[in-house]
């Protein structure tokens, strides 16, 4: 339904090419400003192919730790899922508040360079987020740039835009 509403406009302005490419596939006339986009991608870092080791997977979350992003839930889930494995979740965020930290969860709160961030994306096997409050966020944009599968919630705009994600399981509860 969002796509149909966008088709009513002469042209839709979107923040970056990644979203423009998705919308064009759905017949929406649009252009990208590429003004507010990832400084990481603007720096055009090298993408290094990595062969996944199924016994030692590396998951990456890159974003702020705030209520809307649901990072506390993400680390709590991964603490249980990764227990007794060699898999690792790397959380690159602004603050460690209320995050579950185990031997399988590494939290980075320091500012890092785009080169260091590119290394994290090249190192990981999957990008992961638990947020339901993003349109198509920077993690999706950056993960796509580095050819990483994205594990994400499929509610809202993700599903309607046809963003290529591995959906998180969920149950809807009547309130």
Positions of the model-derived regions?
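Short hydrophobic beta-strand element within catalytic cores of glycosyltransferases
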Residues: 149-152
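A short hydrophobic beta-strand element within the catalytic core of glycosyltransferases
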Residues: 127-128
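Short beta-strand->alpha-helix junction loop in the catalytic core
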Residues: 33-44
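Aromatic "clamp/platform" in nucleotide-sugar-dependent glycosyltransferases that forms part
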Residues: 132
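Conserved catalytic-core segment of nucleotide-activated headgroup transferases in glycan assembly
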Residues: 46-116, 122-123
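A short, active-site helix/loop in glycosyltransferases that binds the activated sugar's phosphate group
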Residues: 10-30
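Short glycine/serine-rich donor-binding loops of glycosyltransferases
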Residues: 137-140
